[in-house]
Amino acid sequence: MMKMKTLLALAISGICAAGVANAHDHMAKPAGPSIEVKVQQLDPANGNKDVGTVTITESNYGLVFTPNLQGLAEGLHGFHIYENPSCEPKEKDGKLIAGLAAGGHWDSKGAKQHGYPWQDDAHLGDLPALTVLHDGTATNPVLAPRLKKLDEVRGHSIMIHAGGDNHSDHPAPLGGGGPRMACGVIK
């Protein structure tokens, strides 16, 4: 009888472990259509450098942005969808600005203010901040709950800023993320 209880306990433990592993696999890989965006670190003087990809996937909760990036500065970085499908530099006030051809934060609903990704009266292109670890990698996915379909973001670009994002226009405009650091065109 003791052997039977032990076998039963082991069987239940195995089933539970398999269920947890299966749930983890589903959490780690959102189901649904996806596109992969090539991302480059912006350097107008010496040429852009590949730093990895961001995979955008449809989920029941919104679009999931899963970075697979390396070679970036550690810390939190502003992460946005920009208006134009370009990462080219453009001149402003006599200076060549990295990624300026991408335009501004994507704002198709005319909110005209920076905010949180779930905030209805903010730019649609406002995403959660991107976390870069001490080794220069970024792999933690972020969710954009107001964006539902890949077709919404095609024909725009992804922008990563040198600084963090306070999801407000105060004290600095557009979250205070500073210079455009890396970019990828969403095709």
From Swiss-Prot:
CDD domains: Cu-Zn_Superoxide_Dismutase
Annotated site location: Ancestral copper-binding site: Y82
One Pfam family per UniProt: Sod_Cu
Coiled coil regions in record: none
Cellular component terms per the entry's GO annotation: periplasmic space
Compartments reported by the entry: Periplasm
Alphabetized Gene3D superfamilies for the sequence: Superoxide dismutase, copper/zinc binding domain
Co-factor binding details: Binds 1 copper ion per subunit. Binds 1 zinc ion per subunit.
Entry's Gene Ontology BP terms: superoxide metabolic process
Signal peptide boundaries: 1-23
Binding site for Zn(2+): H105, H114, H123, D126
Disulfide bonds: C87-C183
Keyword Thylakoid on entry: no
Binding site residues for Cu cation: H80, H105, H161
Keyword field: Copper, Disulfide bond, Metal-binding, Periplasm, Signal, Zinc
GO molecular function, one term: copper ion binding
Similarity comment text for this entry: Belongs to the Cu-Zn superoxide dismutase family.
Quaternary assembly: Homodimer.
Physiological role: This protein lacks enzymatic activity (probably because of the presence of a tyrosine instead of a histidine at residue 82).
Name of this chain's protein: Superoxide dismutase [Cu-Zn]-like
Annotated source species: Haemophilus influenzae
Gene encoding the protein: sodC
